[in-house]
A protein has these predicted regions:
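C-terminal binding/interaction regions
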Residues: 136
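Structural signature of FAD isoalloxazine-binding scaffolds in flavoprotein oxidoreductases
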Residues: 106-120
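Structural motif
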Residues: 9-11, 35-39, 68-69, 89-90, ...
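Generic N-terminal amphipathic, Lys/Arg-enriched alpha-helix
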Residues: 1-12
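Short, well-structured hydrophobic secondary-structure segments
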Residues: 15-71
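Conserved small/polar residues in nucleotide/adenosyl-binding loops
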Residues: 139-141
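Short, structured patches in soluble enzyme cores that scaffold and shape functional sites
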Residues: 16, 93-95, 118-122
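Mid-chain, well-packed structural core segment of small domains
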Residues: 64-105
Length: 141
């Protein structure tokens, strides 16, 4: 991973074999920010796990293992109540037949490259707190 920063904007290049959530949490820790918007991301990933939350508040997971084009990625980076970096990301992929798949991102390993733009909110604080009745952590602003 490499990154460059200009004011509140960070452009991150994530390299083959690196996992997106892991790299972005490490970046938040290394740079010391508590609140950021992930505004865009493109690239090619593999071993993708994504899904949606059903009516009962339980995430339903899907796998997309072959390398696929990451056509859109967005979300945010906050902190847990214990101070750990927490990423919340949604993605859209296109498979090799141009079928689009999308949802909440659980895991994605970069296959070729991922290029992600982050906007740090220097004077903001966002904390993720568990919501007991759902498999979810709400953001407190």
């Amino acid at each position: 991973m490499e990154h460059t920063r200009s004011g509140s904007d960070i452009l991150v290049r994530i390299d083959p074999g690196e996992e997106i959530h892991t790299v972005l949490k490490e970046l938040a820790d290394d740079l010391g920010f508590d609140a950021a918007a992930i505004t865009s991301g493109i690239g090619r990933t593999r071993e993708n796990s994504y899904g949606y939350m059903d009516e009962e508040g339980v995430y339903q997971r899907r796998s997309l293992d072959p390398p696929s084009e990451l056509v859109s990625l967005s979300g945010n980076i906050a902190r847990t109540e214990k101070g750990d970096a927490f990423t919340h990301i949604h993605c859209c992929w296109s498979d090799d037949d141009n079928n689009v798949l999308a949802g909440h991102l659980f895991q994605a390993t970069v296959h070729v490259v991922a290029e992600i733009h982050i906007r740090v909110m220097d004077h903001a604080s966002m904390t993720r707190c568990p919501l007991a009745e759902f498999e979810l952590s709400l953001i407190h602003i």
